[in-house]
């Protein structure tokens, strides 16, 4: 991120604790325990949590929400690419139900600890979300086929596999009341392609503030070097 808002966050201010009952490191996030994987040391947790705080600053290109695009009371959230689950945890009191998709076993352990107080309304799916269904992958459409709830908010942040996720939710995308927070910086053409796709699907959308330089894609980086971070879409 190339903006002054970064200066408001310092990893040295973060206090990392260890839960004696399970050995997992955690930080207090808005009065709730946010657990991290047990392979993270103290400094790694601090760096990670500081990055998460910075990402969700209102001026950040990576911020999922805005003043006009929010999580509402009794929303049903599909958190696609949940990792540590900070987005769901931030809004857990409002949410009617949340589905966390996370394949990594270490992160699943951390998620189970984080959401233990709300386990009656949290479902953890240990698969990648994609455009096919097999032992390791699942599509949004097939997952929802036999579920009693209907999603009202879908957050998609999956390290470049966003297009596959969209391809696997052709039925879900037609829901009349749906909000989507969709990352667009992982691949060079994502913003242009996804904004067009969502427009064709009947969504109104806005881009997040500013731009990002995605350092993980330096080998294939082409002009324009700076990318829009996120699309917020709703019907």
Q: Residue locations for each model-derived region?
A:
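S-adenosyl-L-methionine
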Residues: 1-94, 99-148, 192, ...
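Residues at the starts of beta-strands that form the adenosine-phosphate
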Residues: 96-97, 121, 179
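Conserved S-adenosyl-L-methionine
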Residues: 81, 155-159
């Amino acid at each position: 991120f190339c903006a002054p808002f970064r200066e408001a966050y310092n990893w040295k201010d973060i206090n990392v604790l260890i839960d004696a009952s399970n050995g997992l490191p955690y930080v207090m996030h808005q009065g709730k325990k946010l657990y991290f994987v047990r392979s993270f040391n103290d400094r790694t947790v601090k760096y990670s949590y500081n990055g998460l705080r910075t990402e969700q600053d209102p001026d950040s290109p990576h911020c999922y929400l805005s003043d006009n695009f929010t999580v509402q009371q009794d929303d049903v959230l599909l958190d696609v690419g949940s990792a540590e689950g900070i987005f769901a945890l931030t809004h857990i009191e409002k949410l009617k139900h949340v589905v966390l998709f996370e394949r990594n076993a270490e992160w699943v352990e951390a998620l189970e600890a984080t959401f233990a107080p709300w386990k009656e309304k949290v479902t953890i799916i240990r698969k990648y979300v994609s455009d096919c269904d097999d032992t390791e992958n699942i599509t949004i459409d097939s997952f929802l086929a036999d579920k009693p709830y209907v999603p009202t908010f879908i957050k998609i942040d999956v390290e470049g596999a966003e297009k596959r996720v969209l391809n696997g939710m052709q039925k879900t995308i037609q829901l009349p009341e749906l909000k989507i927070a969709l990352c667009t910086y992982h691949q060079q053409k994502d913003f242009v392609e996804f904004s067009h796709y969502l427009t064709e699907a009947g969504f109104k959308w806005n881009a997040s503030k500013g731009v990002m330089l995605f350092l993980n894609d330096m080998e294939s980086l082409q002009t324009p070097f700076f990318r829009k971070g996120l699309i917020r879409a709703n019907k």
